[in-house]
């Protein structure tokens, strides 16, 4: 296995992953293709999902900043224009969750507004701006204002999740996932602009999910809540593999939060309150994830475990391993605790052997518990290898500190 403690190795891996997508993912008529088989063949040319549309902008903006290829910057601009022109409804300001793109025109397939989607629009705008797309600066403020107006619930200090296309109906479902990615986006917006209100919103989201809400579940983070932010233990119990709202504790979200908490800590002097709580919570969440979810027999972290602590979904997902790699590195550098380097190496060894496609590039999306493949669909809507390349960028960032 390559030495993933070497920054050059991480950059090579990003370049190899980008090579799976670029340039085949770019649709000259607008945006990107979103559905790829293992060998890179596109198996759906028209369906465009907001999450993929935004994540591709992140991918290209980050790639441009690290590799300085003008084609990457052009692709980031191309993707940002698609978000604005195809997903965004100029009459409502909302963003369609899914559109059909044919002959240069977008037709909404699902015009529902999701806070999760807006978080990724904000993330895309922030990274595009950092890459040099000047017009993205105004889009950052516009998207934040939309999230605040339509989804922010001051009495709970968190964002609601979903609203109708015309914004008149707000779904009673509340979820931690949208708030976690909103925190990520707010951090990116702060780092892009220096505007403190983004950092303070990220700080509030992080505390309210990982401390206040976690206190309702013995310090762990449940995914689903009622409108008053009491835990809904039964939501999607009959649909445990739901793509964005699975029933279970999600160890991948524990480690993702651990990473975000320590990203917040880096800006400790600019936070509103003490940063003393961030490291202990990050360690506790990471440690809970690997304790409950690591598979001693086949390796890798399982997807989900139930309230009783037992694994309820033993499939292995690419993003769970990737986010845990990033969190392990951040914790290792922050604490000096060698056990986190052990986890970093163990997770890379597992992922390199089972998830990385050494023939065609990029990572497989999902494997069975025994690491056998479940599908030849490497990158359906939502994947884009944003998590895998993002993890590499995160590790590169902490190596540079």
Predicted regions located by residue number:
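Glycan-recognition and catalytic cores of secretory/periplasmic carbohydrate-active enzymes
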Residues: 1-401
């Amino acid at each position: 296995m390559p030495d993933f403690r070497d920054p050059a190795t991480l950059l090579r891996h990003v370049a190899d992953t980008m090579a799976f997508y670029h340039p085949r993912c770019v649709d000259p008529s607008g945006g990107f293709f979103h559905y790829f088989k293992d060998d890179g063949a596109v198996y759906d040319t028209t369906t465009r999902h907001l999450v993929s549309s935004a994540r591709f902008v992140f991918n290209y903006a980050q790639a441009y900043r690290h590799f300085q290829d003008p084609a990457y910057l052009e692709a980031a601009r191309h993707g940002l224009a698609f978000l604005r022109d195809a997903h965004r409804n100029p009459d409502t300001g909302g963003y369609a969750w899914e559109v059909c793109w044919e002959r240069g025109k977008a037709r909404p397939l699902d015009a529902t507004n999701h806070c999760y989607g807006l978080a990724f629009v904000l993330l895309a705008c922030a990274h595009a701006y950092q890459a040099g797309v000047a017009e993205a600066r105004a889009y950052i403020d516009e998207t934040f204002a939309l999230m605040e107006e339509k989804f922010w619930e001051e009495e709970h200090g968190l964002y609601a999740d979903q609203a109708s296309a015309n914004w008149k109906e707000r779904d009673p479902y509340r979820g931690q996932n949208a708030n976690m990615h909103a925190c990520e986006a707010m951090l990116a917006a702060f780092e892009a602009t220096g505007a403190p209100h983004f950092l303070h919103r990220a700080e509030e989201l992080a505390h309210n999910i990982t401390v206040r809400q976690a206190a309702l579940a013995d310090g762990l983070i449940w995914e689903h809540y009622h409108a008053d932010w009491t835990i809904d233990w039964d939501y999607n119990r009959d649909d445990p593999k739901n793509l964005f709202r699975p029933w279970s504790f999600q160890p991948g979200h524990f480690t993702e939060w651990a990473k975000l908490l320590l990203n917040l800590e880096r800006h400790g002097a600019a936070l509103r309150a003490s940063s003393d709580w961030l490291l202990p919570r990050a360690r506790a969440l990471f440690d809970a994830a690997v304790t409950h979810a690591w598979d001693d027999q086949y390796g890798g972290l399982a997807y989900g475990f139930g309230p009783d602590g037992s694994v309820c979904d033993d499939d292995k997902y690419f993003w769970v391993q990737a986010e845990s790699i990033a969190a392990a590195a951040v914790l290792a550098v922050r604490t000096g605790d060698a056990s986190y380097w052990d986890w970093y190496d163990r997770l890379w060894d597992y992922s390199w052997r089972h998830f990385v496609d050494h023939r065609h590039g990029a990572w497989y999306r999902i494997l069975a518990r025994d690491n056998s493949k479940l599908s030849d669909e490497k990158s359906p809507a939502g994947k884009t290898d944003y998590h895998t390349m993002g993890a590499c960028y995160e590790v590169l960032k902490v190596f540079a500190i």
